[in-house]
């Protein structure tokens, strides 16, 4: 069961992982080209790309990881192994092929928790490594709302995860 589930989950969530990769690529390109003289798109465009990566990257990463806990909409049919026309045993149950994960509320809770955790960790880095009293004071002030928002989204996700009905396979019938 392990390879069957994860082959679909990773393969089908291909588009979510590609969006995450796109975020990381635009970050790398933006850092490289934003200050270069005569860049094609202008400095502001590359700064917008950095903002997109800073927001979408952690949220998408969190939603992709949340699918491991919340599941995804696909069907496993082992009988298809014998079908020459369709030798794939797992198929997506909708035309979105895993992109719907980014719109599931519970997945977004973990995505937003990762986003606010990243911001809190960045502020802690500033506090510990920058020797500027003004920046440290602003970072300390901003750390409180970031931590509160992280806790709200993470605890919402965690409490729901602990209280939701789970699934199990009946060993006698093989039914879920």
Predicted regions mapped to residue ranges:
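Membrane-interfacial helical/loop segments at transmembrane boundaries in membrane proteins
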Residues: 75-96, 168-176
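Alpha-helical transmembrane segments
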Residues: 127-136
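Cytosolic juxtamembrane amphipathic/interface segments immediately preceding
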Residues: 38-45, 95-99, 132-133
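Hydrophobic cores of alpha-helical transmembrane segments in multi-pass integral membrane proteins
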Residues: 1-38, 43-72, 106-126, 140-176
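Membrane-interface segments at the starts/ends of alpha-helical transmembrane spans
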Residues: 7-8, 89-105
């Amino acid at each position: 069961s392990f390879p069957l589930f994860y082959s679909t989950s990773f393969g089908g969530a291909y588009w979510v992982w590609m969006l995450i990769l796109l975020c990381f690529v635009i970050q790398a390109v933006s850092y490289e080209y934003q200050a270069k003289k005569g860049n094609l798109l202008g400095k502001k465009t590359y700064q917008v790309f950095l903002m997109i990566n800073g927001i979408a990257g952690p949220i998408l990463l969190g939603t992709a990881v949340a699918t491991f806990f919340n599941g995804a909409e696909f069907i496993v049919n082992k009988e298809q192994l014998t079908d020459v026309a369709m030798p794939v045993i797992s198929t997506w149950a909708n035309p979105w092929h895993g992109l719907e994960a980014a719109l599931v509320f519970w997945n977004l809770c973990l995505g937003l928790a990762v986003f606010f955790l990243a911001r809190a960790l960045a502020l802690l880095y500033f506090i510990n490594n920058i020797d500027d009293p003004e920046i440290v004071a602003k970072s300390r002030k901003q750390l409180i709302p970031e931590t509160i928002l992280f806790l709200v989204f993470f605890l919402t996700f965690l409490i729901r995860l602990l209280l939701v009905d789970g699934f199990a396979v009946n060993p006698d019938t093989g039914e879920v």
